[in-house]
Regions:
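Flavin-dependent oxidoreductase catalytic cores
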Residues: 1-155
Length: 155
């Protein structure tokens, strides 16, 4: 008998059912910002779904330009970006897998000059000092997270 008898059993999450309990955790591949990154990510993730991964968690995608990991970093804050993200989603779904977008705001670790954070304290690994968010900017950023999540569901 297997030491993990439930590993390959379906898992009902209420809103969806996974074909098994094999999950690929989030990792940044470096393809997210590549000119043909969507196609490359689609092939990368689809191969994992094809070989049995039930749920794939993407690398971090910012909910606003202020939260990208670097200039030109992955962001989902506008419906015009959905076709790019759907390339990846469709590839995984076509192989029988599910995919979840990791929403990631990098805060003071964002390596670009327009970074924001709760306070203007520079990260020890960053040459840029963040702009300290005001109360209204924090509320706007919360809205950015909600919009990103809604767009991710559409993708």
């Amino acid at each position: 008998m297997s030491r993990y008898p439930s590993l390959f059993a379906p898992l009902d999450l209420g809103f969806t059912t996974l074909k098994n309990r094999v999950l690929m955790g989030s990792m940044h591949t470096g393809l997210e910002e590549h000119p043909d990154g969507a196609e490359r990510l689609a092939a990368f993730y689809a191969a994992r779904a094809r070989h049995g991964v039930a749920l794939i968690v993407t690398g971090g995608v910012a909910p606003s330009p202020s939260g990208v990991g670097m200039e030109g970093g992955a962001v989902l804050n506008d419906a015009a970006q959905l076709p790019h993200h759907r390339i990846v989603t469709d590839a995984v779904h076509n192989e029988g897998g599910k995919i979840a977008l990791q929403i990631l705001h990098t805060g003071r670790y964002s390596y670009q000059p327009n970074l924001v954070a709760p306070s203007a304290i520079q990260a020890p690994i960053n040459r840029f000092t963040p702009h300290a968010l005001s109360h209204d900017e924090i509320l706007a950023l919360i809205d950015d997270f909600a919009r990103c999540a809604a767009l991710a569901r559409e993708a």
